[in-house]
């Protein structure tokens, strides 16, 4: 789910890098030589994308591809497939049966046959980030499209760095007031740093941060029990990942920091019918991922 994108993206980026080297030496067998895919089991702890803290364990399919002008990352989740806490609703307990996120980028340089590089900017993309939550009713559905400009940066260091800036169009958003309109912006930074060989595998550090701002949600008429705005116009999600990858198996541990997670105001007082509670949308969460590349 969007809760796990930063963990999952780290694993996929690492999988691609390591698999290329492993293919030269050990010739591991995959279904495709360019569409890199895996099945993962993901455990999440204290994720903060909704008004209540969530823990769950779920099944995930993810894929990564980079071929000519096409750069792709995406995943499909079956939420709460293996269970979760009382606030986690998913495939088996009347929650959403499917959550999907994709990040296709299309190289402007290659599609126009033009070298647009200058300075540290190696290549330019039409960048997209689409999020879909199937849900079972309007209060569980989300459909969000971020679109904009992306680039890869030459840092001169043994690391990769990409930047994307988007405008957001919001369709469904769990019944929030900003549905069916242009609503804010996102800046995304992603980096990958190979560290060392470890236990026969490859250990890397990966970081992802989303900065969201300019949304109308912070100015709507949804107030908490104390008369304060329950939503915000901005949020930050920043993940820090250690990933260990082999030819087929991969493992990662993720620490993720949320600020106004899901654009919920931290410490807002709410009551959805089961008694009052305080929103905890700012703080740390974590993930553990085990996956198999095929």
UniProtKB/Swiss-Prot annotation:
Known role: Functions as a substrate-specific channel for nucleosides and deoxynucleosides. Also functions in albicidin uptake and as receptor for colicin K. Also is a receptor for several Tsx-specific bacteriophages.
Signal peptide: 1-22
Name of this protein: Nucleoside-specific channel-forming protein Tsx
Primary location group: membrane
Regions annotated as coiled coil: none
GO BP term, example: monoatomic ion transport
Acyltransferase recorded as keyword: no
Molecular function per GO: nucleoside transmembrane transporter activity; porin activity
Record keywords, A-Z: Cell outer membrane, Ion transport, Membrane, Porin, Signal, Transmembrane, Transmembrane beta strand, Transport
Similarity annotation: Belongs to the nucleoside-specific channel-forming outer membrane porin (Tsx) (TC 1.B.10) family.
Pfam hit, one: Channel_Tsx
GO CC, alphabetical: cell outer membrane; pore complex
Disulfide pairings: none
Subcellular location: Cell outer membrane
InterPro entries assigned: Channel_Tsx, Channel_Tsx-like, Channel_Tsx-like_sf
Bilayer topology: Multi-pass membrane protein
């Amino acid at each position: 789910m969007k809760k796990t994108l930063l963990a999952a993206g780290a694993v996929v980026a690492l999988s691609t890098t390591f698999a290329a080297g492993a293919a030269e030496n050990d010739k591991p067998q995959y279904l495709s030589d360019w569409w890199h895919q895996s099945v993962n089991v993901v455990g999440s702890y204290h994720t903060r994308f909704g008004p209540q803290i969530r823990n769950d364990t779920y099944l995930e399919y993810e894929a990564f591809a980079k071929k000519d002008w096409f750069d792709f990352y995406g995943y499909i989740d079956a939420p709460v497939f293996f269970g979760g806490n009382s606030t986690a609703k998913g495939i088996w307990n009347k929650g959403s049966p499917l959550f999907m996120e994709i990040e296709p980028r299309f190289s402007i340089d290659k599609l126009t046959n033009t070298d647009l590089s200058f300075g540290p900017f190696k290549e330019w993309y039409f960048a997209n980030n689409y999020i879909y939550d199937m849900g079972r009713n309007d209060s569980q559905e989300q459909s969000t499209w971020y679109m904009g400009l992306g680039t890869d940066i030459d840092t001169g260091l043994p690391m990769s760095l990409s930047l994307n800036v988007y405008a957001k169009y919001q369709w469904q958003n769990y019944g929030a007031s900003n549905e069916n309109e242009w609503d804010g912006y996102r800046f995304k930074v992603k980096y990958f740093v190979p560290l060392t060989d470890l236990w026969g595998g490859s250990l890397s550090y990966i970081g992802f941060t989303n900065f969201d701002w300019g949304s109308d949600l912070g100015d709507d008429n949804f107030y908490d029990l104390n008369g304060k705005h329950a939503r915000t116009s901005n949020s930050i999600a920043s993940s820090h990942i250690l990933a260990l990858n082999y030819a087929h198996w991969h493992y990662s541990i993720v620490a993720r920091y949320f600020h106004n997670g899901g654009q919920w105001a931290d410490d807002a007082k709410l009551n959805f019918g089961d008694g009052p509670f305080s929103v905890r949308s700012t703080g740390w969460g974590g993930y553990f991922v085990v996956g198999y590349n095929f």
